[in-house]
């Protein structure tokens, strides 16, 4: 399956590709651990975080619920639920499916300045 990046910024990825790429991400993160736990960025980071957690044998998964899309248009990032267990992020791994503008990452970095942040994909500028 050929993936074409179109003008609408759609980035179709199959479940098999997401699984394979999430496992590959876990293998790259292996030498950076051990991690106390994973913070999955909802909603996109939930599936990759589960795969990474399984590969790295991490049993503690916290969520950070953020929203930047309102009625299908991008707006300011809103924190719906912080990852309270992660505190400043020391020895925690933040997982999201993709980075687009970087705004979500900036908010997460302010919340957890000592965490390691990783995404499966990055959209081209």
Predicted feature residues:
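PRPP-associated nucleotide enzymes
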Residues: 1-125
């Amino acid at each position: 399956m050929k993936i074409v990046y179109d003008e609408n910024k759609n980035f179709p990825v199959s479940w098999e590709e997401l699984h394979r790429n999430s496992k590959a991400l876990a293998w790259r993160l292996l030498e950076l651990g051990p991690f106390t736990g994973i913070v999955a960025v909802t909603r996109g980071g939930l599936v990759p975080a589960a795969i990474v957690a399984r590969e790295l044998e991490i049993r503690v998964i916290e969520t950070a619920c953020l929203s930047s899309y309102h009625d299908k248009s991008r707006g300011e990032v809103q924190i719906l639920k912080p990852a309270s267990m992660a505190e400043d992020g020391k020895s925690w791994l933040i997982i999201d499916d993709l980075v687009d503008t970087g705004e979500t990452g900036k908010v997460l970095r302010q919340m957890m300045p000592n965490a390691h942040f990783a995404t499966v994909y990055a959209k081209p500028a």
